[in-house]
Amino acid sequence: MMKKILGVIPARYASSRFPGKPLAKIGDKTMIEWTYRNASRSSVLSELVVATDDVRIHEVVQKFGGRSVMTSSDHPSGTDRIIEVANQFSEYSIIVNIQGDEPGIEPELIDGVASLKASHPEWAMSTAAVPLLDFSHAIDFNRVKVIIDRNGKAIYFSRSLIPSQFKTTVPLYRHLGIYGYDRDFLLQYNSLPKSNLEESESLEQLRAIEAGYGIGIYLSKEAGLSVDTPADLEIVIEDFKKRKWISE
């Protein structure tokens, strides 16, 4: 029996670096609409919803024909928002957390992460990575690195350079912020003790690693552009013009 898969796009208005980011315009559409429409091209999602704590985002999504659910404004992380939504949609066995600040997200990335989780019920989660070819990016603390074992499972995530390249040059991989969760694991995630590694690296997924849960890695060919600041938005706008998605 095919597992039912729910895609969730968390969207906050009150971003410290870019307030109102989901409603920023790229051509004639908001960023959240671009993200939603591109994510909806996935071939494996049974349903796609935006999860937001802001009525302005909620109304915009409904206006362009998307599905949106209102969530609490007290969540300390995007994962907590996903958990609230998972509790509302009990019929789905896999929940995919899709970042709302990647308006050009490729549906193949969503399909890869979701399908990997569906084919490995023994893993609690799946996520994605991309080969890291620029060494300046490898030593950038804002770009999370991951080491992958021979079975395609994550060994460790870090903001530091891993592996160290001390004696031999080996491939490096950058983590991409998309997650496929086993529903039962997701609902008990907050009951896991906070990890020292999680606190040290400021990476939530290390809570699962330290508790002994498996995280599968889907290898993508390239990373999409994400928007953290208004300057990032301008880069995305230029990229969309090159793709002919918006006019000059």
Curated annotation (Swiss-Prot):
Family, as annotated: Belongs to the KdsB family.
Biological source species: Leptospira interrogans serogroup Icterohaemorrhagiae serovar copenhageni (strain Fiocruz L1-130)
Record key words, sorted: Cytoplasm, Lipopolysaccharide biosynthesis, Nucleotidyltransferase, Transferase
Compartments it resides in: Cytoplasm
GO cellular component term of the entry, any: cytosol
Stored Pfam families: CTP_transf_3
GO biological process: CMP-keto-3-deoxy-D-manno-octulosonic acid biosynthetic process; lipopolysaccharide biosynthetic process
Name of this chain's protein: 3-deoxy-manno-octulosonate cytidylyltransferase
Pathway named in the protein's UniProt entry: Nucleotide-sugar biosynthesis; CMP-3-deoxy-D-manno-octulosonate biosynthesis; CMP-3-deoxy-D-manno-octulosonate from 3-deoxy-D-manno-octulosonate and CTP: step 1/1; Bacterial outer membrane biogenesis; lipopolysaccharide biosynthesis
Molecular function via GO: 3-deoxy-manno-octulosonate cytidylyltransferase activity
Transmembrane feature ranges: none
